[in-house]
């Protein structure tokens, strides 16, 4: 039975969880990764929470329903891509499987995703939840970066498909730059950038707060988020962009209309410089975070330079974007331009230092944008879980019962795929 039904693919992120069945091109559900629980007191430690079993166990909501429950305590079990509260995560998965996917977990193999640098203990916890609580027949825990690389195959011919590339995975809570060679993540070279979708939302909120007085305070964050998703883009040159707005404001300044949740009145705000200043913090992080000064193009270059010398050219040639925060218009174009500048400057310098005797071969820089970018990780998982090899690399319930959760510490790479 388990082999005949499609596997379930679940990609849990900091902000949103993407879930659906393998073989589909996009997830069936995209829900906020939050859970609303009834708590007698707001601050209850985990030990006490376990005592509140019974009826309270079933009295919780996840996703959009959780956000709409003001009388419940809303928790976000995942922070910066890593699961922090496993009790809540188990309950979250309970509704994901039964209420959203409406699946019988005993009949479906599961593909779950994990962030780079996830600890082996976390894999064990996840295996325990899936095998013990849900009794799944098989589980595979895939690294998000490898799935994002596989998802980028939609944009190239079959002969050019490769599992070597550098993945820029930027979601709501964390941005990682991850080099992958032949399907193996080069763990020692991964860099983490403390700027992601949520930081852009906070930055836009701050810019609006200084200028727009009409926004109801309790709605300022969701207003900033809506503006970010609707109007923001990446500009090629920030000084010229300011000038453009000053010369012809009516062409560039947009209006956002919101509705006050309390008295249902409309409020209108002008959206000006925020449109390009918000996402600009990827390239000038010092605008929002004085502790971090390195632009995303410099980080990518540094990561590739830390990698073994024989994979550097293929990495420059395959920079793959993944995640919702890379969806800003012209993000790929700007990144490719900045990265090319850094690389060309280095080649020129080496030529000068050799006194013109060495002519370095130019390095091809290519940033891959594709139409599956936003749900790249989920779509990559859906592709890989619909191949026949998937069932061979899964850890099975039988293995789990024989050896214990430690089997999930290592998940074989799809070697046959590349």
From Swiss-Prot:
This is Actin-related protein 3B. It is found in: Cytoplasm, Cytoskeleton; Cell projection. Gene3D superfamilies: 3.30.420.40, Actin, Chain A, domain 2 (2.30.36.70), Actin, Chain A, domain 4 (3.90.640.10). Keywords: Actin-binding, ATP-binding, Cell projection, Cytoplasm, Cytoskeleton, Nucleotide-binding. Detected in fetal brain. Detected throughout the adult brain, in neurons from gray matter, but not in white matter. Detected in liver, skeletal muscle and pancreas. Detected in lung adenocarcinoma cells with low metastatic potential, but not in lung adenocarcinoma cells with high metastatic potential. One of its GO terms (cellular component) is cytoskeleton. Belongs to the actin family. ARP3 subfamily. GO terms for molecular function: actin binding; ATP binding. PROSITE patterns: ACTINS_ACT_LIKE.
